[in-house]
């Protein structure tokens, strides 16, 4: 690779530790799925689906500024150098786990409570391959420490628009959610 960039390769394993594929080349994965840096939030993404049908503004709750697609989906890649910065959406968002290492997802609710979910395939150890995040919930994610990469998907309905995205303020979250200080520091810029 050019510019001294290190080529990363990992072997994917199933729950029994057996190889299930050829070594994963992260740069190749980015090219194959046309993944680009996700502005403000972090990680890499590519929109994989956007419904061609639209909901008129008058059919939506007041929190939406205009018409919206019925739904959208993206691929989302996390690496050790990236994280999904704390943010919230005006729509529900569902995470889907596809490949790689477990991901820690911090969710902070409006009532002041919060929870850290682990997205992955080891169900015996409390991981979930799918997590639904309700609208208005502050959320951010990172690879579990020691992880090499994770390929996820997210689905949003009504469909995602950047106008529906709000990046969190670190000081505000620290004041409101003192039980999650370490993760808030990790997942904010």
Regions of interest found by a model, annotated:
Residues 19-20:
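Short, positively charged and aromatic/hydrophobic N-terminal segments
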Residues 13-14:
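Polybasic, lysine-rich low-complexity intrinsically disordered segments
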Residues 23-131, 140-141, 146-148, 158, ...:
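Non-catalytic, conserved peripheral segments adjacent to functional cores
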């Amino acid at each position: 690779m050019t510019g001294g960039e290190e080529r990363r390769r990992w072997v994917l394993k199933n729950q029994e530790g057996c190889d299930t594929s050829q070594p994963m080349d992260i740069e190749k994965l980015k090219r194959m799925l046309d993944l680009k840096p996700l502005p403000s939030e972090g990680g890499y993404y590519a929109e994989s689906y956007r419904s061609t049908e639209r909901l008129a503004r008058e059919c939506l709750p007041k929190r939406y500024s205009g018409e919206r697609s019925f739904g959208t989906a993206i691929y989302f890649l996390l690496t050790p150098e990236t994280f999904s910065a704390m943010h919230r959406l005006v729509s529900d968002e569902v995470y889907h786990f596809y490949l790689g290492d477990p991901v820690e997802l911090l969710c902070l609710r409006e009532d002041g409570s919060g929870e850290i979910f682990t997205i992955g395939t080891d169900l015996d150890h409390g991981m979930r391959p799918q997590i639904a995040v309700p609208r208005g919930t502050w959320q951010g994610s990172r690879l579990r420490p020691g992880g090499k990469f994770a390929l996820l998907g997210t689905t949003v309905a009504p469909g995602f628009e950047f106008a529906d995205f709000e990046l969190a303020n670190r000081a505000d979250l620290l004041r409101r959610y003192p039980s999650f200080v370490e993760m808030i520091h990790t997942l904010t810029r």
